[in-house]
Amino acid sequence: MDTKVLAVAALVIGAGAGFFIGKGEKEVVEVEKVVEAKQTSTLDAVRAKGFIQCGVSQGLPGFSNADDSGNWTGIDVDLCRGVAAAVFGDASKVKFSPLSAKQRFTALSSGEIDILSRNTTWTMTRDTQLGLNFAGVNYYDGQGMMVPKSLGAKSAKELDGANIFTNTGTTTELNITDYFRANKMSFKLVAFEKADEVVAAYDAGRCDVYTTDRSGLAAQRTKLTNPDAHVVLPEIISKEPLGPVVRQGDDQWFNIVRWTLNAMINAEEMGVTKANADQIASSATDPSLLRLLGKEGKFGEELGLSNDWALNVIKSVGNYGESYEAHVGPNTPLKLDRGVNALWSQGGILYAAPIR
């Protein structure tokens, strides 16, 4: 049976053709065309082509970043590799599409990519108006502001009249506007499409403030000429739950992506790592471990996968904690403590539904 798939042609921040959502919020969606396509599940499609196409950032250290040889690393990259391991038993069967914030939803809606795993904030508008589903949260964040130490500012409330740079197509534009209006401060906002353009302009001293998610500030700070000459102010002005996104209408694919993330979180809680996964799988007697590692029940079958899908994920990319520590943790250039991204049993809010 044929079905109509809406290809979203543009998602922009600002006034323009389309519709407005909420009180003055300016996320606008233009539908350029309707594509006639046969109804094929995403799982069938990726199996047919032999790989998963994953949408990532254009270069955000710790989350999705390519080295000089084109090898991608980061916690968002690990999630995509984990899905490939779940589907194919091979984490290498994934290709990466670097996308700007403005391009990302169009690429997913049109079918150019199978998963968007690109430091993307889960909001009501995005969840209910764009034909997309967020499959979970792999990093709890909040928006912050970075300034040169030479500015002398100790608080965001000292930034009246500031020139502020950020990216187009993001929640940061709306959040910073709300914050300055609520605190009765004036400001000038300039938005760039590419993150590297913002970094270069800020590094050249063309503005007073660079604002984005605090994890993003930590990542982009590593690219500055003199990182130690800049400081992230203490205020967190928003909630930014970041996570993977898929198209609506394919519950099986949504479940595969969601449960890949859940498996990584549950594995950390149960002490299953990349190094010990096989050994635990062969010796475990705890029913929860047996279910996670495919030794009991038919949980893989219910996803359309082999029963060792989660074991393959953990052996390939490790548990959530391993991924975090490798890419954004205290021993990386980002030096980010776990904070709220610690397990619920260790003072954080990270919590996955059980496999049962």
Labelled PLM ranges:
Residues 1-26:
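Single-pass membrane-anchoring alpha-helices
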Residues 30-37, 78-81, 85, 149-153, ...:
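Extended ligand-binding regions for polar small-molecule ligands
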Residues 37-117, 292, 305, 316, ...:
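Extracytoplasmic small-molecule ligand-binding "clamshell" domains
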Residues 40-43, 76-84, 102-105, 109, ...:
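Extracytoplasmic/secreted envelope proteins and their assembly/folding machinery
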Residues 47-51, 84-92, 109-113, 150, ...:
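Sec-exported extracytoplasmic/periplasmic mature domains
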Residues 51-62, 70-87, 121, 141-197, ...:
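Bilobed "Venus flytrap"/periplasmic-binding protein-like clamshell domains
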Residues 81, 85, 89-158, 214-237, ...:
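Acidic, polar ligand-binding/catalytic clefts
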Residues 326-356:
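Conserved C-terminal helix/tail region of periplasmic/extracytoplasmic solute-binding proteins
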